Amino acid sequence: PKGRLVTLTRAALPSAERPVLRDVSLVIERDTRLHLRGPNGAGKSTLLRALREASGLSSERVLWLPQNRDARDASTLLREVKGLPNTDRGRVYEVLAALGTPPEALMRTPAPSPGEAKKLELALGLARNVWLVMLDEPTNHLDLPSVELLSAALVDYPGALVLATHDDAFAQATCTSSLQIDAGRVR
């Protein structure tokens, strides 16, 4: 779709019991490529979650990749891929290969590593042509070649991208704009 995917207007975003971010107004368009910057605890993850919730888009249209996953979630992802029709599974395998992960070997793994789980979830999302990719510290648990392959895949991705990362080189390669989050404000 063209146009707006998410709109936040003068929102106050809580984390636990206190507002972390105040007076947040932000529009995510179909072609947005946004880097959220700021120190640890500033509210980058909170803003990502708020954008996901405000989008109103189905989980089929949004890829949300949180900073941390557990092994149980990764095993669920493997089962999901194995249960896909052949054509869809083939698209996931193509993306996995582009991310430097041999798909057949990964499918035989009983418990994927955190890096493999990130690649698997990203492959699932990109293979189903989501409209919005939201990534929280996507380079965690990835080696340098994997980071470079992920960067290339995201550069080629045609939809909206919002990511929170401390990896400025990765953000510069994949995003066209950035917002600084600090002291409860988004600038």
Model-predicted regions and their roles:
Residues 2-187:
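ABC ATP-binding cassette signature C-motif
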